[in-house]
């Protein structure tokens, strides 16, 4: 049986971590494309040379030619400029939309049967543009945002409560920006509602609410927090790991329910836009969008987030 093939578009920080994770997990052979001559070749050679130490056996190739992504099962797009301190994700739209246009044309020509996972920011606009240019079915073009946002939310909760991150289940909806919607009501620790645990810890409902609001705020600004600390770029370990979870679910048909930037056609009252929602990811890409009820406050936050997505995406038209 032929190995799976994963192509990474963009040889920056995220691309490098993606390549290493793909190799360590032996998800398939990996190609890294970048326009900078020598960069993808050097990174892939560096990773390949540690195969005997880490015990992975896959083919790793760096390239400056889109032709080398032919036959890809999954293409992960990280190409684009990262944020700098003081910038929002939306500030990147003009330059990164030009880059995404070229990338999508390359994918369309050389990997027409692939699944595409977009990481580039501003995410909601970039995945929309990628799908529009490739013309691929909506189930085959998705964006990575919610897995990372939910992971950050879960981490903050675990640290606050002093419990294992493995036992926290959290979910975020909406766009990948300051208006994302961390769903407190659906967040739990080993099945126990998180607010109940916070209220028991502080023995004060008002204090518990205050602590949760701070964690929600931190989740919304988590990417910017990393940017401010790094000063020279944006997060790369965490978005790479999040994209790998999605890739693995597709390649291995795991049917995992993961927060995914999907094209909505009426779900959650949204029609014709890519928005973050829980979805089943399997061998057919997005196989099912998981719908559930939102209360009035949650719906209002979702509406605000979707409005921000629409404004950003419509600016591309």
UniProtKB/Swiss-Prot annotation:
Active site residues per record: 176 (proton acceptor)
Catalytic activity: (S)-malate + NAD(+) = oxaloacetate + NADH + H(+)
InterPro entries associated with the record: L-lactate/malate_DH, Lactate/malate_DH_C, Lactate/malate_DH_N, Lactate_DH/Glyco_Ohase_4_C, Malate_DH_type3, NAD(P)-bd_dom_sf
Keyword Nucleotidyltransferase set for record: no
Residues bound to substrate: 83, 89, 121, 152
EC number: 1.1.1.37
Molecular function per GO: L-lactate dehydrogenase activity; L-malate dehydrogenase (NAD+) activity
GO BP field: lactate metabolic process; tricarboxylic acid cycle
Key word Transcription present: no
Keywords assigned by UniProt, alphabetized: NAD, Oxidoreductase, Tricarboxylic acid cycle
Transmembrane segments annotated in the record for this chain: none
UniProt binding sites for NAD(+): 10-15, 34, 96, 119-121
Function (record text): Catalyzes the reversible oxidation of malate to oxaloacetate.
Family designation: Belongs to the LDH/MDH superfamily. MDH type 3 family.
Record-given protein name: Malate dehydrogenase
Source taxonomy: Bacteria, Pseudomonadati, Thermodesulfobacteriota, Desulfuromonadia, Geobacterales
